[in-house]
Amino acid sequence: MRSRFSLVLGLSLGIAASASAQTASPPDPDQQFEGSLSLREAYFQKRRIDPWHYNFQTATARLNALQQRQRAEQVQRKALTVSNSLVWQPIGPAPITGGQTPVSFDFPSPVSGRVAVIAIDPVDSAVFVGGAQGGIWRSTDTGASWTPLTDSLGSLAIGSLAISRTDNTPGQATIYVGTGEGNYSCDSYGGVGVYKSTDSGATWSGPYGNAQFNARSVNGLAVDRADPTHLVAVSGSGSYGVSCVANPIRPPRGIFNSNDSGQTWTLTTATSLPANLAGSQLIQDPHTATTWWATMLTQDLGTGAQGGLYKSVDNGVSWTQQMGSATGLPALTVALERVWIDGTDDGAGNSVLYVGTSEPASNKPSESNFGRIYKSVNSGVTWAELKAARGYCQGQCFYDLPIHAEPNNPLVVYTGGAGAFGIAPHGGAETTPSLFMRSNNGGTTFTSHVLSPSTNTALHSDMHSIVSWPGHANEIWVGNDGGVWQSTDGGNTWNNKNTSLQVTQFEGCDTDATTANRFYGGTQDNGTNGYAGDVAWPHLDFGDGGFALIDQVVPNNLVHTYFNQSNNLIGVGYTTGGFATTQNNYLTSFAPTNGIGAGDRVLFYAPLHLDRGAHDSLYFGTQFLYRSDLFFTSATPTFAKLGAGADLAPAVPPSSTGGELSAIETVANIVPGSPAQTIFTGSDNGRVFRSIDGGLSFQEVDTDALGFYVADILVDPNDPMVVYQARSAFTGADPPHTVRKSIDGGATWADASTGLPDVPVNALAPDPTVAGTIWAGTDVGMFVSEDSGGTWTPYNPGLPNVAIFDLKVSKPGSSLLACTHGRGAFLLSSDIIFANGFEN
């Protein structure tokens, strides 16, 4: 008999359808700098870029997919005859307790997720923050609590925030939000334009400028203080990072003006401004309102000297290059990956300006991202380098390089970088360059301000935003990969503000088969964490967390991947102590070896799988498939290569480069009388192999999906002959071929994606109560099929418009766990009581 969970779905969806060595702590990828970040970018890129049609409009496809989903939901709502439905409930992390900072052993701090921008309205005492894909949140109690404001908007990727007021009426601030994250990581989603609120974020209109900004990131946005109907914005590459799409078809990047309060936007086409430069940052001159400054990048244009600092003296109409022309600013010889600008009025008729660049170090002239800062004390007429700040963004200028000049105090300037160099694991002295620095003498010297012993906290790595509270001297707020912090004394002490801010970017998660509401998940730059019924998730292990698994028989056995890199680190973290352990064992590919080839091709987040039949057998994927038997019970677990060392991700022509495994699934053998397991593997270049002899040999079984990334493989728990694949890609096809199905144990495959929009499908899960019902987590939300993949319908009540990266059945019980990339985790549970009293 159907439970209430299934009956409600049937009512709503059926109607709609008719319409190595063990170490104490693994290396932090933030300390590996650009090399490791580029691997994370490549991992994300492979799941979203059409490998055959590089001009395909991937971010435009995302917006189209979201609109298709919303149209289907409108039909669904109109068709419903009952008002009740199961609703996805947020379950955190809010926050992650004991989270990782550069000195986590001494100062474990609550963390939330990547905060890209911050803006403050002093009239309402309101702080607004924008998440990487978490949308806009507001706090009116100085960060004690947070409320999401934009969950239903077309993009939750935030690139810029601007607040405008014509008076001090409470609740009447005008807020502009530029969508599309501008931090130039491949998981920086593109946006859809500019949204506007005239009631301090209670309601929104837009998106405006969709034709100009769709698929881009609005990296800088400012309201003219002399004319609030005039706005200036700069747009960047947007979808999926700095160089993740070759020559995409998208609107031109550049500098834009609006003269009607943000409703329409016009690209600046002055001959002095080269076409299609990417904008990085924008400010109105602190002293002269008709002067504007914009930092620009060439990125994929191959014309490095054209990027840099541009100035307008006619209120944004025309712009001139300052690099190489203004005294003290060097001519560029390499393409800059990012540039930052900020400034303040010195009170004597001049603007004090600071420009941070991703220039190379002097001993590595061909490599960018070293970091230099130039200062002008005469409104940009002349400049001088601040040599004390050399290397301030620590090799990651493309990702984190903020500078903030304290308003009305030309002597105080703050800088942000990647990580806390020079801090020993247990309270060693701080040295510069550092994650966060302050100068009290205009940049002659800098001091590091990362630790806060008196408040028992420390800053997280990767700084993205630094702002002052208007009118409050020395009060600053910062946003980084771990969330939000506040200081009221210029960074000497810090107050952690990651309370109810649910913006965690999950990569993978799992559920406990024996205990309800016990989950485990890996996150971007915030480690691997656990859930045991409270929205505050305890932090369990460090680094970047990827695949995360709970032993379904012995639930204290936990295993997960960190980041992986060929010839650097390949391995797993694990514990047999459950959530009580705060430090995992780290098993690498080096002496004493774990059996995995150190030079293997491997994804940044390598796939893991615990055997369905033999719970202590762990599978690990590179281009080869490895298995470790008795993994948790062995004193020194090691992996052995399966399939006689067969490459299970060989190159797909016309490419000559092989891929890496991305998905693993096992099931009791489908061959009658055979005790051997059936094993499936999928790769990032679309290869699918099967073994029916427990891994002795493999045969390729699906060659019809055009090389698209295999994100998940699911064997139907009610019929092992039925197998599904999730393909993570924008395919440009209708139907999109992002779900494939086999009814003969994986021997042959057919498309099963009718009704899905053209968008990456990241995860699949069976319905916990009804055979033949399958759920799919995508980049634009959740979809469900009640006919074994025949047709699909959106099901998103309570879910923000965010990408779902993993999806698991919660056992025991009848719940589904959805782990998102930017809004934390959500649970769809049959324990919810509806207004009409519907129950099991």
Task: Pin down the residues of each PLM region.
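Bacterial N-terminal signal peptides that target proteins for export
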Residues: M1-V8
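Bacterial N-terminal signal peptides
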Residues: V8-A16
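Boundary at the C-terminal end of the N-terminal hydrophobic targeting segment
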Residues: A19-T23
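Beta-propeller blade termini and top-face loops
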Residues: A24-S830
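Low-complexity, Pro/Thr/Ser/Gly/Ala-rich linker/spacer regions in secreted
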Residues: S829-N840
